Amino acid sequence: KERMITLSYKINSQPQTNDSYNTYLDIEPDENKLDIIKELSLKNFHSDGKTNTMEQTFQVDYTTPIGKLHTIETGAKYIFRRNSSDNRFYEAEGASENYAYNENRSSEYRHLNHILSAYAGYTLKYKGFTFKPGLRYEQTIQEVKYLVGPGENFDSNFSDLVPSVSLGIKLGKTQNLRGGYNMRIWRPGIWNLNPYFDNQNPMFINQGNPNLKSEKSHSFDLSYSSFTSKFNINLSLRHSFNNNGIERISRLITDKDGEIFEGGHKAPYGALYSTYGNIGKSRETGLNFYLNWNASPKTRIY
């Protein structure tokens, strides 16, 4: 093997537009009958939206052998992601077509993501034994700005170490034993993080949690395989767990005088207040067995 360095760049853009109308019609416009549109204060509305996601990725990878048994891998990646949304909402009185711009129901925001990561890996191969540990570091910086509509500007930073390790052993010419561990992370979305106190309906209040951490899932796997002219056998065991899943938390305001939140926001007595927290826990275990028997040159049983 020889030393190798790889440089790569990728750009991706996904613009979308949406233009929709919602119109109410009175199918029985008899003057003597109930005008349902006026009775229920229904309004025609028009929504004109534009969204775009643009992502650029810069990456460098380097691999070098050390002697006949060892290999070192290292690299770095930078991702710049820009999400923009501009949704304009127009309302008309009753069933008319005289639409007027409603800023309170419109929204426009910019979401910038800077993701920096670096990794290092080592591989040892000796006869039938393979050992491969690795470690990746990720730093994520988010900036969210609301230009129109309800929302609160905020920044968030995440720092994560992501380890992995794998082992492989050849048990003779036709048998293999493998095991490993890896971690996966999920970062909270802007709606989970946004600290805006949404009390448009004062009895159902929603607020994000800017103190959320990345959700981490740990997985362990062990597998055995054997291949002969008559039988192919594969047995695998997998276990994964998560101790800090992002879940919705809701509670009733039980204080007769209501409750005051950070920023001076007040939730009245009896309101349902909802936010998010790293409170989720999950466990999953799976066992898989596969057998392929070549009973005869023309018969194969799975």
Protein language model regions, located:
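Outer-membrane beta-barrel strand-turn architecture
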Residues: 64-68, 123-128, 161, 169-173, ...
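Short secondary-structure boundary/capping segments
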Residues: 23-25, 91, 150, 194-197, ...
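Outer membrane beta-barrel strand-and-loop segments of large Gram-negative receptors
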Residues: 46, 55-59, 100-106, 213, ...
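Extracytoplasmic loops and strand-loop junctions of Gram-negative outer membrane beta-barrel proteins
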Residues: 37-46, 99-106, 115, 145-151, ...
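Surface-exposed extracellular loop regions of Gram-negative outer-membrane beta-barrel proteins
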Residues: 141-143, 173-218, 239-269, 274
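Face-selective signature of the C-terminal outer-membrane beta-barrel domain
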Residues: 1-145, 235, 283-302
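Membrane-embedded beta-strands of outer-membrane beta-barrel proteins
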Residues: 58-60, 118-120, 163-165, 210, ...
